[in-house]
């Protein structure tokens, strides 16, 4: 994602390059922000009998943000507050921006800390390839798409064993069916790298049918996806997704509960006196309670703390949701 941040004016100029960039723009935009960009809308000049579709540059005050992960769609709805001088009758009307890769959008932040904005931009700027992880054993294969957003398990493929075959031929049809799916995903998602992970013998056999970097680990299938993410192979990904911080949280819950704050009230209290060293916050909570969330995060940055924004639809996200949407590791 290409971007320029004017901290003084609180303006971010963004050009999304990949579909996953839309998620980070979704995190950036809140109700009340001003979003500007080129768009096309129906326009009927005064005296004209019929309207026509006209390209124009607009600014809207944001009222609603709609992000659909599986459709890779981001729509921003609001009221027009800025428009080209020669265009009349548009200001005050409602408009929807469709934000897509390759099209510039300008966001003027009206609330929250610039440090939080910078954190979101840093997350978006992580140089990670698009990885298709094929986690496989002799019973199941799981295909997971790994990007700066984390891991999305796209397909699970059970091995439909043909009892009439023996030895390696028992797995041949299974490997071929998995490879067919792999080639389809590579085409649709523009994959940079395929990683084949699982028990050594299975990975060696599968590698004759599925081309990719081989990683030996104890498990395949869905369990193997999570084993892969916990491994040291993609430490930068683990850091950005908050997996390292969450691992520390789990250890401290077991041994030093007084150095952990769980839920909004505990975290607020800790943040107010500068105790919060690291905060993990759910992306959905930031959208459900934006004023509350931005106030907490601003205080965290003002006291030198770190923030990790975690997707709810991940293993860590589900745990944080159960703990009250936000957790903190404390200094003392």
UniProtKB/Swiss-Prot annotation:
Q: Which GO terms describe its biological process?
A: nonfunctional rRNA decay; nuclear-transcribed mRNA catabolic process, no-go decay; nuclear-transcribed mRNA catabolic process, non-stop decay; ribosome disassembly; RNA surveillance
Q: Which InterPro entries match?
A: eFR1_2_sf, eRF1_1_Pelota, eRF1_3, Pelota/DOM34_N, Pelota_arc, Ribosomal_eL30-like_sf, Transl-rel_pelota
Q: Where in the cell is it found?
A: Cytoplasm
Gene Ontology terms for molecular function: endonuclease activity; metal ion binding
At the top level, the lineage of the source is Archaea
The UniProt record lists the keyword Repeat: no
List keywords of the entry alphabetically: Cytoplasm, Endonuclease, Hydrolase, Metal-binding, Nuclease
- Cofactor section: a divalent metal cation
**Nuclease: is it a keyword of this entry?**
yes
Q: Name one Pfam family in it.
A: eRF1_1
In UniProt terms, what function does this protein have?
May function in recognizing stalled ribosomes, interact with stem-loop structures in stalled mRNA molecules, and effect endonucleolytic cleavage of the mRNA. May play a role in the release non-functional ribosomes and degradation of damaged mRNAs. Has endoribonuclease activity.
Q: How does it assemble?
A: Monomer.
Q: Supply the domain comment.
A: The N-terminal domain has the RNA-binding Sm fold. It harbors the endoribonuclease activity.
| Similarity comment: family membership | Belongs to the eukaryotic release factor 1 family. Pelota subfamily.
The protein's name is: Protein pelota homolog
Protein encoded by which gene:
pelA
């Amino acid at each position: 994602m290409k971007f320029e941040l004017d901290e003084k004016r609180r303006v971010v100029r963004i050009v999304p390059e990949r579909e996953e960039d839309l998620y980070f723009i979704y995190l950036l935009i809140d109700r009340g922000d001003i979003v500007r960009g080129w768009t096309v809308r129906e326009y009927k000049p005064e005296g004209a009998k019929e309207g026509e579709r006209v390209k124009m540059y607009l600014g809207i005050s944001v009222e609603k943000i709609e992000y659909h992960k599986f459709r890779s769609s981001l729509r921003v709805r609001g009221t027009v507050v800025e428009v080209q001088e020669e265009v009349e009758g548009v200001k005050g009307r409602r408009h929807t921006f469709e934000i897509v890769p390759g099209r510039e959008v300008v966001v003027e932040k009206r609330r929250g800390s610039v440090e939080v904005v910078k954190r979101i931009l840093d997350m978006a700027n992580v140089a990670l390839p698009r990885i298709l992880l094929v986690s496989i054993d002799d019973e199941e294969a799981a295909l997971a798409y790994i990007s700066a957003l984390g891991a999305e398990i796209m397909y699970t493929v059970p091995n439909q064993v043909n009892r009439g075959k023996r030895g390696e031929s028992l797995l041949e049809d299974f490997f071929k069916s998995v490879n067919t799916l792999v080639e389809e995903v590579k085409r649709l998602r523009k994959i940079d790298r395929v990683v084949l992970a699982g028990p050594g013998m299975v990975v060696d056999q599968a590698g004759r049918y599925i081309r990719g970097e081989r990683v030996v680990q104890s498990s395949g299938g869905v369990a193997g996806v999570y084993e892969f993410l916990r491994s040291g192979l993609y430490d930068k990904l683990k850091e950005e997704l908050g997996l390292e911080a969450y691992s520390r949280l789990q250890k401290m819950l077991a041994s030093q509960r007084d150095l952990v704050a769980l839920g909004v009230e505990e975290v607020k209290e800790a943040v107010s006196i500068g105790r919060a060293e690291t905060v993990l916050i759910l992306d959905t909570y930031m959208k459900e309670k934006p004023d509350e969330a931005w106030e907490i995060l601003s205080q965290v940055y003002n006291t030198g703390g770190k923030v990790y924004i975690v997707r709810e639809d991940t293993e860590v996200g589900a745990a944080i949701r159960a703990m009250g949407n936000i957790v903190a590791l404390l200094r003392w």
